[in-house]
Structures are given as structure tokens and as C-alpha cells.
Design a protein with these regions (language model features):
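Alpha-helical coupling/stalk and coiled-coil linker elements that connect catalytic or binding modules
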Residues: 1-62, 80-83, 111-115, 129-298
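N-terminal helix-rich structural modules
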Residues: 66, 76-81
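Short secondary-structure subsegments characteristic of cysteine-rich extracellular domains
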Residues: 84-100
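The cytoplasmic-loop to transmembrane-helix boundary for the fourth helix
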Residues: 119-123
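Phosphate/adenylate-binding glycine loop and adjacent helical scaffold
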Residues: 126
Length: 298
């Protein structure tokens, strides 16, 4: 069909509406690229899939495909032994969660879409591992490993000791007049106290920063230097352990690159098919009976 005919039919508006029902970026692109077909077998196959998806929606409701984010680049990185970051691993988890939800939602249904759903591999053990270890893109769970839990426990103990020492200084009559404010603050990753510039020589310790006006000097009291050093050392150990955990999760995921690729491809395809079904539902469409005789009966 030529461009002029499509424009006259306002085909682009139909495509825009169709795209709005797709949950994933990849499926929205499939919607945007959709053009009228000419092969009757392909047309009938597509109509059957759309009708079956619509029947599933009426029978059990729809399933969300919004968790289907593009993991192709992550899969390629896994294939060459790279370590994925938290964002990439959470995307894989989201795809597997969607696969599990879709597979269970439409169990015991037999139609043209059955093979798609049966081919989904939720990889539950891998998904559970990722969820147990990664809370968000910025946070790894204490339960990700016993070593990480112990490191963070030691960090909390050291931080508590620092606060105890600094509170002694804050509450000491001999030093209160030297302080610009009665708070504990962080400068360059070190616990410090805000000291009036004219009294900086009265507080033994290391200067880490000063205010824009120069009236406040941020000093790390000598009493907490070792404890701050301990925390810094523990932070390095924490980061090393986090990197080890991410490497272990990536190694586990690398054993399932074929399944991950298949799941992603199937979910995008189903997202596209169910978007067409949702559009059909919105417009209360009926499935036409196609022919090759150029006969139209409306």
C-alpha cells in the first residue's frame, strides 16, 4: 500500500494508538514499523494470534510487559565474561519476573500462543539470587554474603565509636565555645566538627575543609583519626566484596545467555501481539475472514 493511501486512511494515528498499548520499547518499535501485509497466510496467522490474545485477555485479564527492558547488550557482555553492574542485573531480573508472571498467568490455555508461553524460562533460582542480593541500583543487601554483612557490622561499630568520641568533644565545656555549630559533619569522607576559624588551633586534629567565607574550619579531631582510617579501610573491603558478588551473579547469569535471549525475544513478541489485542478490544473489532478474490463484504 502506497504512502498516500496510508496518509488518507490516517494509518499513523492507528499506529500511535497501537504503540500506546505496548509495555516495552522494543515492542513499541515493532508497532511503529508495522505495515499492511499482502501474504494471506501471514495475515491469517497474525489475525489468529491477535484473536487468541484477545480471548486470553477476556478470560484472565492482561499481563504487564513493562518490565521487559532491553538486555541484549548485557547478554553480549555476559558472553565475553564481563561483570554486569546492578542496573543490568536488575534489568535481567525484571525480564525474568515478567516471564514468570506471563507463564503462570496463562497456564492451561491452548491456542496459537501456547508455544510462546511454554518456551519461556523464568530461571527462578537465578532471579531469586539477584533479588536477594540487590535491593536497588545503589544498594546491595547485607544478606548478599556473610562477609559483606560482617564488614558492614564493623563499619557501624566504628561509626558509633566515632560519634561517641565526637559527642564528648561537642559536650565538653572547654571546647563548646570553639565550635561554629554543635553538629557532626562529613568532609572528604571523614567525620569532622565545624570549628570557628579563630579557634582552629584549640582543636587538635586534621583540617579537611573550610566554609566559603573562611569563618568555619572543618577539623577531624585527633581522637577519631584512627577510627576514620578504620572505616575507610572497611569501605574499600566493602567495595571489593560488592564487586565479587556482582562478578559471581554475572558468572551465574552467563550460563543462561541462550535462555535470556529467548525470553527477551518472546516477551517482546507477546507484548506486540497483546498490544494489537488491546487495540482490537478498544475499538470492539471483529476478526475478518480473508480471501484472495478481492471480495469485500462489510
Amino acid at each position: 500500500m502506497d504512502y498516500k493511501s496510508l496518509k488518507t486512511l490516517e494509518y499513523h494515528k492507528i499506529i500511535e494508538k497501537l504503540s500506546s498499548y505496548a509495555g516495552s520499547e522494543a515492542a513499541r518499535k515493532m508497532c511503529a514499523d508495522l505495515k499492511p501485509m499482502t501474504d494471506i497466510n501471514s495475515i491469517n496467522d497474525a489475525l489468529t494470534q491477535t484473536s487468541d490474545a484477545l480471548s486470553r485477555i477476556y478470560a484472565k485479564g492482561s499481563v504487564s510487559f513493562s518490565g521487559v527492558t532491553n538486555i541484549i547488550d548485557s547478554i553480549k557482555r555476559l558472553e565475553v565474561g564481563s561483570t554486569l553492574n546492578t542496573h543490568e542485573l536488575l534489568n535481567i531480573s525484571a525480564v525474568l519476573t515478567t516471564a514468570a508472571a506471563a507463564k503462570s498467568h496463562y497456564e492451561e490455555t491452548n491456542d496459537s500462543l501456547t508455544d510462546y508461553f511454554n518456551s519461556l524460562e523464568p530461571l527462578t533460582p537465578l532471579n531469586t539470587q539477584i533479588k536477594n542480593c540487590i535491593i536497588s541500583e545503589e544498594e546491595i543487601s547485607d544478606d548478599a554474603s556473610g562477609t559483606l554483612r560482617d564488614i558492614r557490622r564493623q563499619m557501624r561499630i566504628s561509626a558509633d565509636r566515632i560519634h561517641t568520641e565526637l559527642n564528648k568533644i561537642l559536650n565538653s565545656p572547654s571546647t563548646r565555645s570553639c565550635l561554629q555549630d554543635y553538629v557532626i559533619t562529613m568532609r572528604q569522607g571523614r567525620y569532622c566538627l565545624p570549628v570557628k576559624a579563630e579557634y582552629k588551633s584549640q582543636i587538635a586534629g586534621m583540617i579537611h575543609d573550610q566554609s566559603a567565607t573562611g569563618s568555619t574550619i572543618f577539623i577531624e579531631p585527633a581522637a577519631v583519626v584512627k577510627l576514620n582510617n578504620d572505616i575507610r579501610e572497611l569501605e574499600l573491603k566493602e567495595q571489593a566484596e560488592i564487586e565479587r558478588i556482582l562478578a559471581a551473579l554475572s558468572a551465574e547469569a552467563s550460563a543462561y545467555t541462550d535462555e535470556l535471549q529467548s525470553d527477551y525475544t518472546i516477551l517482546v513478541t507477546l507484548d506486540f501481539i497483546f498490544a494489537k489485542a488491546q487495540l482490537s478490544k478498544f475499538y470492539k473489532c471483529s476478526c475478518p475472514i480473508m480471501n484472495t478474490d478481492k471480495y469485500i463484504n462489510i
